[in-house]
Amino acid sequence: MKRIGCILLILTIILTGCKTGNKNKNDKENKTAVENRFEKKNENIENVKKESSGQISFGYLNEKKDVYEYNGKDVEIPFYLENQGNKNESVATIGLLLFVDGNIQDYRIEANGKIQTMQKITLKPKERKEFKLIFKPVSGKKGDKVGVIPATIWNPDSLPNEKNPSWGNNQQLSANVPLEIKMKSNGTNQLKATKKHVKVSDIPEEILNDWKNTYVSDEYDSLDTSVNFEMESSVKNKQILYGKNRKVPITLKLYGGASVNEKITIFINNKPVKIDKKDYIKVKTQKGKMIIVTANLDLSGYDRINSIYAIVMTSGGDYKIQDISKTDSLLLINK
């Protein structure tokens, strides 16, 4: 689906939190869908509301450029972030991630700046920052056309109360429509994939029935257009995951959407972690099937309280069909 104009995605939270949804790629302006993410009895609800509220816009500065080239020199994509909140609102902290060909991409935003996986940018109300996303593609071979997509994480370092872990809108993901990179040279191609922990199963009847009861139209299969990506928690309906003996078992479930090639990256404290010394998990989604990933992560060297989430991004030419999804963040307790 072709990109039209520039992307302006406004994150707006009114009293209650909201969850950002996948954008419509043909929309010139995309707004988040509002969802109440707070429980009425949450004892620290006011604090969560305050730190997870705001209004941010971001996008490409060059509205007309859809395609970039990599010829061995750095790719540079002009970009902006703007805090559109009122003067009495708080400073916004945004974590900015970049994905190339489905892989997390290290980059910098200044010519001599620090290369990082996530750049964290603070914005006062009404403040706007313009910069460039500067990088050498971590994936792709000469002759390929690969997708590149920036994604923001709202208030990335926020951690909820352990007794009642409500995130509000903290650590929610929003993304631009993808751009294309024509590979005139090979990318660095240093990242390694694993398929070891992946299995494919039928989507459970319970889930299918829930969808049938919710979406009654016979005109289309709603699961074909809705990506569902989940990380199982240790306690049902509670966003918390407990480790034991410096290890933690994780289970990821991915279903719905188109049949595409995807890459899954797991993050602890906003940094990608390896699985069996590999950088990401390679999967192929299938209509009517669920991808299940089970693995154990080593928590040696981590503090007691952490955040954990996973992001899945299409690879190859499939970025034109479907782009990026994130699990809800979980509070990871390292024992």
Feature-to-residue mapping (PLM):
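Bacterial signal peptide processing site
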Residues: K19-G21
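Short beta-strand elements
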Residues: S158-T214, G316-K335
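Short acidic, flexible loop segments centered on an aromatic residue
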Residues: N86-D106, L254-P272
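Short glycine/proline/serine/threonine-rich loop/turn segments at secondary-structure transition edges
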Residues: E89, V138-I149, S158-P160, S300-Y309
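Short edge beta-strand/loop segments characteristic of extracellular beta-sandwich folds
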Residues: E76-Q84, P249-Y255
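C-terminal motif of bacterial Sec signal peptides marking the signal peptidase cleavage site
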Residues: I14-G17
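Intrinsically disordered, low-complexity Pro/Gly/Ser/Thr-rich segments with frequent PxxP/GP/PP motifs
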Residues: E110-G140, K277-N296
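Low-complexity, acidic Ser/Thr/Pro/Gly-rich terminal tails and inter-domain linkers that flank the onset
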Residues: K25-N71, K199, P204-N237
